[in-house]
Regions:
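Concave beta-strand-loop units of leucine-rich repeat
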Residues: 26-33, 49-62, 77-88, 96-113, ...
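Bacterial Sec-dependent N-terminal signal peptides
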Residues: 1-29
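ATP-binding pocket architecture of kinase catalytic cores
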Residues: 183
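Disulfide-braced loops of extracellular cysteine-rich modules
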Residues: 36-39, 67, 152
Length: 215
């Protein structure tokens, strides 16, 4: 594994073997609007391993329209997509349903107005999450337990091959059994914490043998 640093953004080159030859997937960490613009200005669409976009505290806000331009630059994500501190991000639609994220894991952290997660309702793409599925300090996220989003949001997930964590989601959850009605397997930690309007958690017998921590 070889780490390559530039003055614009951090790139991690990860080799992999496919069809008898060695290729490389880059991982990118983009800090702030200027680094995002520099990245999306590139003309080569590529498959990446990990993609992280951060809006540092106190920095210039990153407009949602600029975030969605990632779709012009990234064809597929095979590792983890991380969205952190994005003050203007409201939706996953137009992002994870355009970039091929069917083999990815996801981290959404400290995105105060993120609400629409309905792109995850595509069962063909997202019934299995190939890594972590973490939503942390995104209070406006609408789950499948909200009346207006029943059978939408990320309610179609059946398996998470990493950690599954929901932390500090404060939207209404009128039908808790609808959050993960089909969930059968979590390979990592399963944590529900600080979801103040989720008064109980259940999806029948499915969670009986899962490592669930409900706080």
């Amino acid at each position: 594994m070889k780490k390559i640093c530039s003055s614009i953004f951090r790139v991690l080159v990860i080799p992999y073997v496919m069809c008898g030859f060695v290729a490389a997937q880059n991982s990118y960490t983009l800090n702030g609007l200027s680094e995002l613009k520099e990245f999306t200005a590139g003309s080569v669409e590529e498959t990446v391993e990990n993609l992280t976009l951060i809006e540092p505290e106190g920095s210039e806000m990153i407009p949602e329209s600029e975030i969605l331009k990632l779709t012009d630059r990234v064809k597929k994500i095979t590792g983890t997509l991380t969205m952190e501190g994005l003050s203007q991000l409201t939706t996953t639609t137009g992002l994870i349903d355009v970039i091929d994220c069917s083999e990815a894991g996801f981290v959404f952290r400290d995105c105060p107005v993120l609400s629409d997660m309905d792109a995850f309702a595509d069962e063909d793409k997202f019934s299995v999450i190939h890594g972590d599925f973490i939503i942390e300090n995104c209070p406006q996220v609408m789950t499948g337990a909200a009346t207006a989003h029943l059978d939408k949001s990320f309610s179609k997930i059946r398996e998470v091959q990493g950690d599954l964590k929901l932390t500090n989601i404060t939207t209404a959850m009128n039908k808790p059994q609808k959050i993960f009605p089909y969930l059968e397997k979590v390979e990592g930690d399963f944590v529900v914490d600080g979801c103040s309007r989720l008064y109980y958690f259940t999806n029948g017998d499915n969670t009986e043998n899962m490592p669930l921590t409900y706080i």
